[in-house]
Amino acid sequence: MKKYILLSIIALIFTKAYSQDNSILDAYKDSIINYSTAMVNSNNDKIKIELSDKISGLVFQITEQEKSINYDLSELKFVKVLTSKDKKFRVFTWVIPFTDRTYGYRGITQSYNQYKKEFVSYKLTDKGDKLGFAQNKSLSIKKWYGAYYYKIIETKRGSKKFYTLLGWRGISRTVQSKIIEVVTVKSKGNITFGYNIFDIRNYEYFGKGNRSSKRLIFKFSTQGNMYLNYDYQTIVIASKSKSKSSYKKKKSYKSGFNAQSSPDKAKVKTKSLKDNMIVLDRLVPTSPQMKDFYEFYYPESNIIDALLWQKSKWKYYPDIDARNKTNSNDNAKKPIEYNLVPK
């Protein structure tokens, strides 16, 4: 009986402590909702920045709470929170919509330090406008290619983990972009953005033969909407089978003629593969003369491409058979809501 009472008291203490921790996190969450709503609705850029700074402070307060990695923050509207399945990485991102229709990008990461057995948090500093050839660079938290992330995908190569992020970045009044970013986390929780895990040698948008991309940046018109998400879809793979040439004798009306021979043509085999993959619209210019003028790039109607995780890389497959319904959640078509995307 005494043992039962003691266990009940211990359980009550832990429940009370958990409730207190959650009440603190609830208060931080409510404040973030209020500040972010005010930031988006404000017509004063200085006030927008001040409110964003307050949001940053609250996010850091959340990450400092023990076991906050498990706390549900899906109620946040303007601050997107993505958490890896292994609960070792979390990223917060939001956008400051300035009055001149440009954007500021803010982010904070929470990652696990294996040595100290605790989480560490880092502020991300956007340098996207100053980075030349950003697609080919590994970047640090102080040189972040800022974006609003709306999807996280976890993959592995041996013991090395990759967190692939799908995101949005507004570039100008006429050009926006969708991004496929790759994050790696070191043993001490240090964050690196960008990694060469893309097999896109036949991807015309990035130039055939491309082997150096560490992130993919898809630029297109603000008047269009590009679908980019992680879906369960079908790929039809074609391959030529190598077979030994057989020789068929043909009749000759003249004796002494060598028998003519004709090799068999290579047979094309196809197989359907159904799996989760990154699914995306194909972007094309309105005319060949508009190549590389991204304000004239739009999704091609009814042509869907994909990136499938194969042999530790995201391998490009063109024109997939996208018969399965695509995800309607995660705002994959237009991730920034509430008039944050330029019309």
Where are these regions (language model features)?
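Short beta-strand elements that form the blades of beta-propeller/WD-repeat-like
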Residues: 88-95, 161-169, 276-282
